[in-house]
């Protein structure tokens, strides 16, 4: 095992920034390459690092949710993303939502201020780019929409064809364009909350909207790409095509959202989530889409209260690129045929911002240990971080990206009612993580 003194990281997203700080604080000289603002992916528009596409991208903060458990583990391990998220948090019920602009600006400031990190605004187009020569390790953390040239280089290196699916982004509208005579505030079973704005639908309005979604014109995909949808990012029109009531029993379910004007539960409810601290923008919850922009104007304005909606950002679709991790990556996330090149974040096959950040942090911990010739034991599969790591190591017939969920962990060794199982999984995860954490060298705990 060769000690590391220098590393290049390609990509200033959550995974790249997490990895960079871990390495820098271990005394490793880090050069962080970010192609923005000279070049942008289809999913990004800000020159800042750590750009999120949605204020609620960090998802649930409940201690018994899989992603909530992962966040707890990340906080214990000194996660940069968790620190910045807490500092830029906005009210969102049980979710960890942030002011996206403040979050990205804070991530950028953290990288620029960290001793040992040199930020270079330059696009890396190949694993053999001259700018990457001379480093002890190269980390590719270019995200799910890596540039075509870098993706081709990576495909050549792993010797396998990339797999593609589409992440669909929900529209954002201006708050002052919402008709408040039709919308009402409240979270499920918590009518006093002002984290969500709700647009109630009657039966006729729901079915007319659902029909418009099904018939709406969608953005075209490239001929050479096969379209696959990850369940967690299913476009709303794809859900609508599954059945007449799929939306009403899914993202538009009215449970716990009685209309205070009528005292009755609507047939369906479209929720709007605040996008920033000032509540000047709202995200249409569950309305991620690949409808053409003109169709978004027409169809989403069919929602009661949104007849005059002003779109701050339209929904869109972007490619997600990832490798078949069990086949092409070693346990330390290095390429099997290029052991000096490591992958981090969503390109490995973890799915989601929190998961990508955790993966980058974990890679940073493993590489930082090499500075002192140490080994860090793999986290137990019963905890969230270990379950994600095991997902990338476990050979399967058809490898697909995965969020953190308790289904990635072993079955419970006891019988339990369905409503109690999450709590038991979460408690087991905490116990196993605590035992593993005690084995870590002090340098790996911060």
Swiss-Prot record:
The keyword Calcium does not apply. Keywords: Cytoplasm, FAD, Flavoprotein, Methyltransferase, NAD, NADP, Transferase, tRNA processing. The keyword NADP applies. GO terms for biological process: tRNA methylation; tRNA wobble uridine modification. It catalyses: uridine(54) in tRNA + (6R)-5,10-methylene-5,6,7,8-tetrahydrofolate + NADH + H(+) = 5-methyluridine(54) in tRNA + (6S)-5,6,7,8-tetrahydrofolate + NAD(+); uridine(54) in tRNA + (6R)-5,10-methylene-5,6,7,8-tetrahydrofolate + NADPH + H(+) = 5-methyluridine(54) in tRNA + (6S)-5,6,7,8-tetrahydrofolate + NADP(+). FAD binds at residues 11-16. It comes from Oleidesulfovibrio alaskensis (strain ATCC BAA-1058 / DSM 17464 / G20). GO terms for cellular component: cytosol. It is found in: Cytoplasm. Gene3D superfamilies: FAD/NAD(P)-binding domain. The gene is trmFO. Its main location: cytoplasm. Its EC number is 2.1.1.74. This is Methylenetetrahydrofolate--tRNA-(uracil-5-)-methyltransferase TrmFO. GO terms for molecular function: flavin adenine dinucleotide binding; tRNA (uracil(54)-C5)-methyltransferase activity, 5,10-methylenetetrahydrofolate-dependent. Pfam families: GIDA (PF01134). Its cofactor is FAD. Belongs to the MnmG family. TrmFO subfamily. Disulfide bonds: none annotated. It comes from the Bacteria. Catalyzes the folate-dependent formation of 5-methyl-uridine at position 54 (M-5-U54) in all tRNAs.
